[in-house]
Structure formats: C-alpha cells, structure tokens
C-alpha cells in the first residue's frame, strides 16, 4: 500500500431497500447496493458527487481496503485530497451497479425463493434501472441534489441518464469516453463476448455452480480488451514480438498479454453479470440527431463532455454528437478532445491535462 496522496483505508458499505420496480415491470426485492464514500458531506448536503463506473468497475474507486492492498481503487489518481474530485471539498459516492457482481444485487445474489444464486433467473437490468438504484442510495443518504454526476464509458451513459431522468437532482454532469447509444459495431463486439460465454460447456443455461464458464468469460474479456487499447499503443507495447515462455500457446506477445488479461479477469468477475451488463449497454439509446436533442431537452445541469483522439471503441464523433445535441437544446456544455495514444482506457489513466480539466470544471461553475 502506497499512501502518497491517497485517502487511505476505505470500507465498502451496503444499503438495502425493500424493492425496485424495473423498467420492464419486474420487481427486484430486496435490493442491495454496495457503495463507498470519500470525504465529508457538508451540513447543507450540497457538495456530493456521484461517480459512475464502467463495465468491469465497482464501488472501490479510491483508497485501499487494507494495508496489504497492492493497488488502490480504479480512479485513485482523480479522487482524494487536492485531486480533481477533491475530498477536502466534496463528498464522493461510488456504488456498484445492480446486475454487477461486486456486492450489489445481481446474478450472484441469493434468490429469496430458492436460497440459491439467481444466475440467469435474475431480471433484465437496464442503464435506467442502474440509475434508479443509485437514486435510492443518494436519497437514503439525505441528499436531494448532487453537485455532480460523473463517469466514463458505461459510467458516462449513467451520467447522461441522470441528467434526463432526474434533471432537478444534479447541478453538473461529466461524460467521458462515452456515447448516447451503441453502434452496430459496438453491439457486435459485445455479442461475440456473450457468445463465447454461451458456448462454454460450463454455461449450463446460466445456472452454473462453482464450475463457472471461465474459458468463455476469458475469451469475452480478450475481445473486449482489444477495444480498450489503440493500434499505436499495441504497436508500441508489443509490435510483432514473440511471447515470453511457452510459444505453443500463442505466436505473439500481444496474444500472451490478452490471454493473461482474460485469465485474470475470471477471478474477479461473473459470466452472468458480463452478459447482463453488456446487454444493458447495447439496449441503451437516447437516439441520434433531433431525437437525441429532444431526449436531452429537459436537462437543467451544466455538462462537460470529454473524448480521446485514439479511442476507437467510443470515438470522438460520438461525443461530438452528444455535444451538438446539447447545444441544439440550448444547454451549457463544454467539450474537450484530449490527445492520447492510450485508446478507450485513456479516461482511467493519470493525465495531468485531464486532472486540470476536471478540476477546472468543478471549481468554476460559471
């Protein structure tokens, strides 16, 4: 554990609610939400910021869970004393999405009627449902209006949804490396990942036991991880170099890297959750052009939209489309395209320019 600039040891908390009526009419009961908080809520409760995570993220956005942790939370470079999301000024909340597998209600949760994990019996969850659950959590903390909702990738979709579903519940919205709806290509990559899981002999219609479809999930992660990097970054990192070690498994270093990413992912994620969350991504749509402008028309908050030059999963054009529609709807929006060779994952990585942009947006509300 390296405490330099960190907020230190953090405990994951759990909030339970009686029920949540989902968009499709299903009732999820009870509902558990895993979350973490950083900083102190002001007496007027006007300094709260909600951070929304991406597909494979969780509630652990900053700090450490124990002194033996080797790595801090996934956005520790941006959350903490004096950082972009300054815990000396703001009360930061990050929760695991429902449908996920890091403590919130999802396929791994115990079905109250069977006393066994839901598995594929868990109801379909949408981005809208994820946001509904977050709203329950925020209200339970006594917060009527968030100072900001921020997120990258899938987290950016959640932030967008907050702005239109609860327009009077946030003052600022930060959308990074995201989109208002998936293109056919983006859906295609997710479908390949899902099919890899479904074709695993251990899938068992989503009602698997401890012998889970690890091979299928690893392949899904390998496919997904390709889209998180850029061509330049892969060329720089791997080129056409041979792998180290067993050359029978793969001919190139990039293949060895992807195999490692897949194998390590299955130890921290659930195959059902991967299917549920990617389907939520694919089904989310605010439309295009006039339809998108209309969808954003009731938003009242200020927006910051950030894209990355080398992001080919959610390319800058999709961010510019959001910006164009916000401007057409006469909303206050600031747009930045950061030059980065890191691909889609750029929003997760430490970048002095990004730190400056986020901090400046939050500290200068006018």
From Swiss-Prot:
InterPro entries: AB_hydrolase_1 (IPR000073), AB_hydrolase_fold (IPR029058), HAT_MetX-like (IPR008220). Pathway: Amino-acid biosynthesis; L-methionine biosynthesis via de novo pathway; O-acetyl-L-homoserine from L-homoserine: step 1/1. Keywords: Acyltransferase, Amino-acid biosynthesis, Cytoplasm, Methionine biosynthesis, Transferase. Gene3D superfamilies: 1.10.1740.110, alpha/beta hydrolase. The active site is at 153 (nucleophile), 311, 344. Disulfide bonds: none annotated. One of its GO terms (cellular component) is cytoplasm. Substrate binds at residues 221, 345. It is found in: Cytoplasm. GO terms for biological process: methionine biosynthetic process. One of its GO terms (molecular function) is homoserine O-acetyltransferase activity. Homodimer. Belongs to the AB hydrolase superfamily. MetX family. Transfers an acetyl group from acetyl-CoA to L-homoserine, forming acetyl-L-homoserine. Utilizes a ping-pong kinetic mechanism in which the acetyl group of acetyl-CoA is initially transferred to the enzyme to form an acetyl-enzyme intermediate before subsequent transfer to homoserine to form the final product, O-acetylhomoserine. This is Homoserine O-acetyltransferase.
């Amino acid at each position: 554990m390296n405490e330099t600039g960190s907020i230190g040891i953090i405990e994951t908390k759990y909030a339970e609610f009686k029920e949540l009526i989902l968009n499709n009419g299903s009732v999820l009961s009870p509902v558990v939400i895993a979350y973490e908080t950083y900083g102190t809520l002001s007496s007027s409760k006007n300094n709260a910021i909600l951070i929304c995570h991406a597909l494979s993220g969780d509630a652990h956005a900053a700090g450490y869970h124990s002194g033996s942790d080797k790595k801090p939370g996934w956005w520790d470079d941006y959350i903490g004393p004096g950082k972009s999301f300054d815990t000396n000024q703001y009360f930061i909340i990050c929760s695991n999405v429902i449908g996920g597998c890091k403590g919130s209600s999802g396929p791994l949760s115990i079905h109250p009627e069977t006393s066994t994990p839901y598995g594929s019996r868990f109801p379909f969850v949408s981005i809208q449902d994820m946001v509904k659950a977050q709203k329950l959590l925020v209200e339970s903390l006594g917060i009527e209006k968030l100072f900001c909702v921020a997120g990258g990738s899938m987290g950016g979709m959640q932030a967008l949804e907050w702005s239109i579903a609860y327009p009077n519940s946030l003052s600022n919205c930060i959308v990074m490396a995201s989109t208002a709806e998936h293109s056919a290509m983006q859906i295609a990559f997710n479908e390949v990942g899902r099919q890899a899981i479904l074709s695993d002999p251990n899938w068992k219609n989503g009602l698997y036991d401890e012998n889970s479809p690890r091979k299928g999930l690893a392949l899904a992660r390998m496919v997904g991880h390709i889209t998180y990097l850029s061509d330049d970054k892969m060329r720089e990192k791997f080129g056409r170099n041979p792998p180290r070690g067993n050359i029978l498994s793969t001919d190139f270093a990039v293949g060895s890297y992807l195999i490692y990413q897949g194998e390590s992912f299955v130890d921290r994620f659930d195959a059902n959750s991967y299917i549920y969350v990617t389907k939520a991504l694919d089904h989310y749509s605010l439309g295009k052009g006039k339809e998108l402008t209309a969808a954003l028309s009731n938003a009242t908050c200020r927006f910051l939209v950030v894209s990355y030059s080398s992001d080919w999963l959610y390319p800058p054009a999709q961010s510019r489309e959001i910006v164009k529609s916000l401007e057409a709807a006469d909303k206050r929006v600031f747009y930045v395209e950061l030059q980065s060779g890191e691909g889609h994952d750029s929003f997760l990585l430490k970048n002095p320019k990004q730190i400056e942009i986020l901090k400046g947006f939050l500290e200068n509300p006018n």
